[in-house]
């Protein structure tokens, strides 16, 4: 019993000492990046971008469950450089190769929210396009609103912006320390959160594949091999071959991934929503000379207004 009480006392002292170490910080999850130029204190957005924050934290603490075996069990960011620095724009790091093309061995989806690149000190994910996040991140020197909707903002500098502004190319990340203040931050399990993201993504992928398989089996096929299913029947007139029609669309890969859509709700459901583009029906002609994909035109000719 004395042993148990001693362990409990040690735990309480540890929690209190963590709180006293950074008394100026409000409750939340923080990352202190120690660089060759000084320290940068960042607050991470675990409520709005839990997956991106979990990725960063688990890499920093060395318990990310998805990293390439070469990085397994290692504090990923220690010793890496800021490989890309652009004056009056941003500093970028997190690439183990130092070239801008390296990563942890996996990619994950964007978490686009109302968080904006609205000033200096914004922490955001570098990427090579939609759904290509890995380990590379950048911190802004100034407002960069053209990046909104394209890069996931997941934190901000609360102390050390002068250090950010002083960073030069090839300066080093010495260490990244994660600081948990308050109950919610302490119970945020980054490794488990990130692992569960991939498990759920796999489950959704399997569900989509099964749904597509069922759809193929119930489809009606034309002589050309086009398969179609009318899920909702309208009461309008048939599509006329000599007229322009307005139509919504959603195009998928065979494995169930979304390629493109004109429907906002579908774009959001597949985490491909782009606030910079309109979501509205497109005009289409279905005659033989129209510059549309043949199968798309054939499918439209089988429909009526409202289908």
Where do the language-model regions lie?
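Cross-family detector of peptidyl-prolyl cis-trans isomerase
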Residues: 18-307
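Bacterial Sec-dependent N-terminal signal peptides
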Residues: 1-25
